[in-house]
From Swiss-Prot:
<feature type="propeptide">
    <location>
        <begin position="31"/>
        <end position="49"/>
    </location>
</feature>
<dbReference type="Pfam" id="PF02044">
    <property type="entry name" value="Bombesin"/>
</dbReference>
<dbReference type="GO" id="GO:0005576">
    <property type="term" value="C:extracellular region"/>
</dbReference>
<dbReference type="InterPro" id="IPR000874">
    <property type="entry name" value="Bombesin"/>
</dbReference>
<keyword id="KW-0878">Amphibian defense peptide</keyword>
<dbReference type="GO" id="GO:0006952">
    <property type="term" value="P:defense response"/>
</dbReference>
<dbReference type="GO" id="GO:0007218">
    <property type="term" value="P:neuropeptide signaling pathway"/>
</dbReference>
<keyword id="KW-0027">Amidation</keyword>
<keyword id="KW-0732">Signal</keyword>
<feature type="signal peptide">
    <location>
        <begin position="1"/>
        <end position="30"/>
    </location>
</feature>
<keyword id="KW-0165">Cleavage on pair of basic residues</keyword>
<comment type="function">
    <text>Stimulates smooth muscle contraction in isolated rat stomach strip.</text>
</comment>
<feature type="modified residue" description="Methionine amide">
    <location>
        <position position="64"/>
    </location>
</feature>
<keyword id="KW-0873">Pyrrolidone carboxylic acid</keyword>
<keyword id="KW-0964">Secreted</keyword>
<protein>
    <recommendedName>
        <fullName>Bombesin</fullName>
    </recommendedName>
</protein>
<comment type="similarity">
    <text>Belongs to the bombesin/neuromedin-B/ranatensin family.</text>
</comment>
């Protein structure tokens, strides 16, 4: 009987650890996806600026965000 309760306890502990790691991985993946979306927006802005202003690409990267 003691062995059965020990197995149940270990199983529940293992499931708890798996759930914790899954939540950590999920939150990290969401952060990476948000950063990728920001980078995609910057690349789109660079392409639009280069075609509309005929600016060289090195100037867009260097001067971006300065006022």
């Amino acid at each position: 009987m003691l062995l059965l309760s020990a197995v149940k306890t270990l199983l529940l502990a293992w499931l708890g650890i798996v759930l914790v790691f899954m939540s950590i991985i999920k939150s990290a993946m969401l952060d990476f996806l948000q950063e990728a979306g920001k980078l995609e927006g910057i690349e789109t802005y660079k392409k639009e600026a280069q075609t509309s202003f005929m600016a060289p690409s090195w100037a867009l990267g260097h001067l971006m965000g300065r006022k």
